[in-house]
Amino acid sequence: MAQTHGSKQQAQRLEQGAESLRHGAQAQSRENNVSLSTVSHADEPSQRDESSRLTVRMENTYQLGPTKPFPVATVNHILEDVLTTYLQEAQYDPEFCRQMTKTISEVIKTQVKELVIPRYKLIVIVYIGQRDDQSIVIGSRCLWNPKSDTVSSYTFKNSTFFALANVYAVYFE
């Protein structure tokens, strides 16, 4: 219960930060609206530093498959809800989109973790790009077990940009 409360507080902090970013980005006007926005895991140091991580050794359960399947439909609903909530009224701004990719991916990860699906590793990737009569192809390749591993995906579009969110769920044996 305390963990759920903590993750809800984290989600609220992220939403407040996103709201301030949304208003700040809309207040700015840029002369050149065509630009490139990139985000990498190396852009900013992690909130957790390596020394604070505890090494946990778990005994082997000899369980080769999940006890219940990954709830793809529920995660798809989370993706749709989060992307629509955060981006419905937004306009494309490179700095705003850069921050929103981080915020949205953290919110999605927090909400999916609240489903408490045991023994699944989660990877959340969010892409946001400008819609300016161009084409883009986004692909991913994964080596996994199709019986237990899966992906959920949702695409959001408005008049100035598109957003794609993917959640990869890989069963940890």
Curated annotation (Swiss-Prot):
Family: Belongs to the dynein light chain Tctex-type family.
Residue stretches of biased makeup (Polar residues): 1-13, 26-40
Descriptive protein name: Dynein light chain Tctex-type 5
Region (Disordered): 1-54
Originating species: Mus musculus (Mouse)
Family matches, as Pfam families: Tctex-1
PANTHER family: DYNEIN LIGHT CHAIN TCTEX-TYPE 5, T-COMPLEX-ASSOCIATED-TESTIS-EXPRESSED 1/ DYNEIN LIGHT CHAIN
InterPro entries: Tctex-1-like, Tctex-1-like_sf
Biased composition, class Basic and acidic residues, residue ranges: 41-52
CDD domains membership: DLC-like_TCTEX1D1
Taxonomy, superkingdom: Eukaryota
Subunit structure: Interacts with ZMYND10.
